[in-house]
């Protein structure tokens, strides 16, 4: 046999030991095989004929040789031990949100054995990488909409927040810490727009760096504005000078503190700003073990507390998020596991 061949194992007749032996061969075998059961023409035991058995005549009169005869062969689903083991590994990877590992294992199985769930795992693997182009393409194939926030201008923020949550659940605390700053800046900016009516881009200039468009505060656009007066006054009180460079969460918090009267919102922003400043440099510039206790000791909050504050801040933005949206990865996992059970 070569890789293009499939072995057909007929378990319709023979002693019980012979049939069991063929089933064991299929279960333990590492080669492509199918277990075949052939029903009798009348659907029950054949009449036993031991004498005067004219093979040639019976073959000539065999109705199965007629065109259009019913196919009495039926494949018996009998997964190999290898398939069973690999699918259990796939399930374990999915339950810990390691979709690329699950996809790699799925690809080691024959394509016909994973047709029910392979595309869903691929969809999940691209989703966690924020590869929305391929996620959208795969949704067309799977017909499973995994993105609760559909707007292209808003979903990137929410999906990014979900990946932060996944890093926390997986105990990847260094990556969890490093991923906080981008979402904090984006959330603060969206909050400033929704709660205070201030659009940061109105006070910035665009520039290109390393082939990508960036932005920085524009001294010219800030001059003579209330926004400019607030940030300049804040730094002057500390004996410093506001430098109109990149936009940081600190700047956005200063503006929110001045223009918003919501004390709870300002406390949330204060907490996250302190978390960001107290621990991000530790993870970025030192070789150090970071645990949940490390985070608590340096910030006063466990990872789950930080994630809870990020979730709460979304409620101050213009992105409409239901509580169940935060469980969308678990819902996606249930869908994949369900499809694996429906093979």
Predicted regions located by residue number:
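Long, low-complexity, Lys/Arg-enriched
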Residues: 1-8, 15-343
């Amino acid at each position: 046999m070569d890789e293009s061949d499939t072995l057909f194992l007929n378990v319709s007749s023979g002693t019980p030991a012979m049939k069991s032996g063929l089933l064991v061969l299929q279960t333990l075998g590492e080669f492509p095989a199918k277990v075949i059961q052939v029903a009798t023409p009348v659907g029950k035991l054949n009449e036993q004929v031991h004498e005067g058995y004219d093979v040639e005549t019976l073959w000539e009169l065999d109705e199965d040789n007629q065109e259009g005869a019913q196919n009495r062969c039926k494949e018996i689903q009998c997964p190999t031990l290898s398939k069973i083991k690999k699918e259990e590994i796939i399930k374990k990877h999915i339950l810990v949100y390691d979709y690329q590992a699950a996809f790699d294992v799925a690809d080691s199985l024959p394509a016909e054995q994973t047709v029910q769930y392979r595309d869903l795992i691929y969809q999940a693997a691209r989703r966690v990488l924020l590869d929305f182009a391929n996620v959208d393409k795969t949704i067309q194939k799977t017909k499973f909409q995994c993105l609760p926030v559909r707007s292209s201008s808003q979903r990137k923020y929410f999906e990014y927040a979900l990946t932060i949550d996944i890093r926390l659940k997986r105990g990847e605390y260094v990556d969890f810490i490093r991923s906080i700053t981008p979402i904090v800046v984006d959330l603060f900016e969206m909050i400033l727009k929704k709660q205070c009516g201030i659009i940061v881009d109105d006070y910035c200039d665009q520039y290109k760096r390393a082939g990508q468009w960036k932005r920085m505060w524009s001294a010219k656009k800030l001059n003579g504005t209330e926004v400019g007066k607030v940030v300049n006054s804040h730094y002057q009180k500390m004996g410093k000078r506001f430098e109109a460079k990149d936009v940081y969460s600190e700047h956005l918090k200063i503006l929110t503190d001045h223009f918003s009267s919501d004390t709870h919102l300002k406390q949330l922003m204060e907490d996250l700003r302190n978390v960001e400043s107290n621990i991000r440099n530790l993870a970025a510039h030192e070789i150090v073990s970071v645990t949940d206790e490390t985070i608590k000791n340096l910030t006063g909050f466990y990872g789950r507390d930080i994630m809870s504050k990020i979730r709460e801040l979304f409620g101050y933005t213009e992105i409409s998020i239901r509580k169940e949206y935060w469980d969308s990865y678990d819902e996606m996992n249930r869908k994949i596991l369900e499809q694996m059970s429906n093979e």
